[in-house]
Amino acid sequence: MELDIKGIMDRLPHRYPMLLIDRVLEMVPGKSIVAIKNVSINEPFFTGHFPHHPVMPGVLIVEAMAQASALFSFTDENGGLKCDGAKTAYYLVGIDGARFRKPVVPGDQLRLEVEAERLSRTICKYQGRALVDGQLVAEAKLMCAIRSLEE
C-alpha cells in the first residue's frame, strides 16, 4: 500500500512544521513501512542548526521514524483507520540504541524503514532505520504509547 501527502495527513495529526513524512512507498499494516522525507533548505530548523553548516537534528530523524510507525500501526488490512485519531493520542515514550552515523543535509531524501517488534493496545515497540542514497544514517529502537483522549 502507498500513501500520498493527503493520505498521510488524513492519518496523522501533525502539520507544518512538524509533519515529517512526505510519501509512503510501501506499507504492510501492523508490520512495516517504508516512507520518504524530502529534506529542504526551507526547513525551519536549518535557521539555527547550523546556519554555516545545515544539518537535520537527529531527534527529528527519530521523530520521523515515530510518525512512520504511527501510520502503519493505525491502518487496518483494508487501508482504513483502526481508531479515531481525534480521540487517540500516540506518544513516543522511549528511544533505545539511537545511533546517528552520517549527517542529513538539505537536498537529501531520507528513506525511513520501520518494522514492528511488538504491538499491543497500549504499548508498541519498533526498529527504525533511516537511509540516504542506500547508506544508513540513523537507527533506533522506539517505544510508543497509545492512549485514549476520552479517559
Swiss-Prot record:
Swiss-Prot/TrEMBL GO biological process terms: fatty acid biosynthetic process; lipid A biosynthetic process
UniProt keyword list: Cytoplasm, Lipid A biosynthesis, Lipid biosynthesis, Lipid metabolism, Lyase
Subcellular location: Cytoplasm
Catalytic activity annotation: a (3R)-hydroxyacyl-[ACP] = a (2E)-enoyl-[ACP] + H2O
Record GO cellular component, one term: membrane
Entries under CDD domains matching the protein: FabZ
Xref: Pfam families: FabA (PF07977)
GO molecular function annotations of the record: (3R)-hydroxyacyl-[acyl-carrier-protein] dehydratase activity
InterPro entries per UniProt: FabA_FabZ, FabZ, HotDog_dom_sf
Main location: cytoplasm
Domain of life of the native organism: Bacteria
SUPFAM superfamilies xrefs: Thioesterase/thiol ester dehydrase-isomerase (SSF54637)
EC number from the UniProt entry: 4.2.1.59
Family: Belongs to the thioester dehydratase family. FabZ subfamily.
Function: Involved in unsaturated fatty acids biosynthesis. Catalyzes the dehydration of short chain beta-hydroxyacyl-ACPs and long chain saturated and unsaturated beta-hydroxyacyl-ACPs.
Name of the protein described by the UniProt record: 3-hydroxyacyl-[acyl-carrier-protein] dehydratase FabZ
